[in-house]
């Protein structure tokens, strides 16, 4: 992509309404534009990152054996009245009436709809286990939307729902989701710590929130410092293997890690003092097991192998897809701008032409652009007739992990400059070697399946 042909409305000044780093940088980098309080248009650069994140979520859900689908944003109130949540949910749920005066709502979550659907079509234990998920826009009428996409009123969520015959099978689904979430966040360059949490309006007996440590987090968290040394890495997991999934759960949840709602001072005090930590955290996902609470209310039963009709055991599992952009920026930035992890960057590499209009420099940049594209990468070539300092500032602001700088002086020696955004280190290489180096880095970030 040529920057001269791209829509990238960067801002030189920091908008006054932006209170935290991620909001400031997303506005300055031309990623979003506020449409109304807590509601944003996603401009091309922001939309590209959003789709990168969405793809990773899809890939890891499919790798875990979960099945994608899509449910509507507008829901009838009938099912919510059956579950008792239409009145209990509160004013954050947007209620409306259609032209026939029927109660409708803009769904903040989908437990009722998915339970009714599965109850209609799944009648035998032979159809189990089953996990369905979708990625869809939601709306919650926050009293005070703030912090950009971190606490907006409209947001993109992945919601998954498992249906199982027994509690034991449903708890395996819970563990399977925990494993897939750990892998999902690491692919995005994040360490998201699973913490015991409160179940809130969804309900349930078991729940963990996944939190990214950041000074701007809304939650106060308490944890054993040893947990920050844990990495999922590239280990292979058989998601059908109960023992393997349970072992990962034990590894990542056996140490103390809780949000303020479930914090226990006595248990925390038992941790050696040099390992006790308190911090702020950004919630980026949550998993729940809530048994037969919804299936009993909404009539989702199956016939078991003894011919008895029994309610399904269920869980609900969410990832804040749009919120993740803010969390990644909060965790990965400097005073110059964003530093995207390779897994979610909008473009894989920037190309900066130091002397636009110079025939040799122009030809070298075009050749680099073609070579990177032939390697399966998406470069962003800054071909504008601007001063070099302005081009570097733009590249630093939008945070592409790698930059290739091309100028007449280097070309005389047959080299270009490859720079890492994260470390700031530069190296002179031949153009072919620079392309090979960038391609090698991204080989570890290729799609793992066809996704959707």
Swiss-Prot record:
PROSITE patterns: AA_TRNA_LIGASE_II
GO molecular function, one term: ATP binding
GO biological process, one term: prolyl-tRNA aminoacylation
Record-linked HAMAP family: Pro_tRNA_synth_type2
Quaternary structure, from the entry: Homodimer.
Family the entry assigns: Belongs to the class-II aminoacyl-tRNA synthetase family. ProS type 2 subfamily.
The name this protein goes by in its record: Proline--tRNA ligase
Native source species: Jannaschia sp. (strain CCS1)
């Amino acid at each position: 992509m040529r920057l001269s042909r791209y829509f990238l409305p960067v801002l030189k000044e920091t908008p006054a309404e932006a209170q935290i780093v991620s909001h400031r940088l997303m506005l300055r980098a031309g990623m979003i534009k506020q449409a109304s309080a807590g509601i944003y248009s996603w401009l091309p650069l922001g939309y590209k990152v959003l789709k990168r994140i969405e793809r990773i979520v899809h890939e890891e859900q499919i790798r875990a054996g979960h099945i994608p689908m899509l449910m509507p944003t507008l829901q009838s109130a009938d099912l919510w009245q059956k579950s008792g949540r239409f009145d209990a949910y509160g004013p954050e749920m947007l209620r409306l009436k259609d032209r026939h005066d029927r109660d409708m709502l803009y769904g903040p979550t989908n437990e009722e709809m998915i339970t009714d659907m599965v109850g209609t079509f799944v009648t035998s234990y032979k159809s189990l286990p089953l996990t369905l998920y979708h990625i869809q826009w939601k709306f919650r009428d926050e009293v005070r939307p703030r912090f950009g996409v971190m606490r907006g009123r409209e947001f993109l969520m992945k919601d998954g729902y498992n249906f199982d015959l027994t509690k034991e099978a449903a708890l395996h689904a819970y563990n399977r989701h925990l494993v897939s979430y750990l892998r999902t966040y690491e692919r995005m360059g994040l360490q998201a710590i699973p913490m015991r949490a409160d179940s809130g309006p969804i309900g349930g007996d078991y729940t963990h929130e996944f939190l990214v440590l950041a000074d701007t987090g809304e939650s106060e968290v308490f944890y054993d410092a040893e947990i920050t040394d844990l990495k999922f890495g590239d280990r292979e997991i058989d998601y059908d293997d109960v023992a393997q999934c349970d072992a990962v759960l034990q590894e990542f949840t056996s140490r103390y890690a809780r949000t303020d709602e479930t914090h226990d001072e006595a248990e925390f005090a038992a941790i050696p003092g040099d390992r006790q930590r308190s911090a702020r955290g950004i919630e980026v996902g949550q998993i729940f097991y809530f048994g037969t609470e919804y299936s009993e209310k909404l009539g989702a039963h199956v016939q078991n192998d003894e011919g008895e009709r029994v309610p399904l055991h269920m869980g609900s599992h969410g990832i804040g897809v749009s919120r993740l952009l803010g969390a990644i920026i909060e965790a990965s930035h400097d005073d110059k701008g964003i530093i995207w992890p390779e897994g979610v960057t909008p473009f894989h590499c920037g190309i900066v032409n130091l002397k636009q209009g110079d025939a040799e420099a122009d030809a070298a940049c075009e050749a680099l652009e073609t070579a990177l594209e032939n390697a399966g990468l998406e470069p962003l070539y800054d071909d504008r007739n601007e001063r070099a300092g302005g081009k570097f500032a733009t590249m630093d602001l939008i945070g592409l992990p790698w930059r290739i700088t091309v100028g007449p002086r280097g070309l005389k020696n047959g080299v270009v400059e490859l720079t890492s955004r994260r470390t700031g280190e530069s190296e002179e290489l031949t153009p072919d070697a620079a392309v090979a180096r960038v391609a090698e880095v991204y080989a570890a970030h290729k799609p793992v399946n066809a996704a959707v």
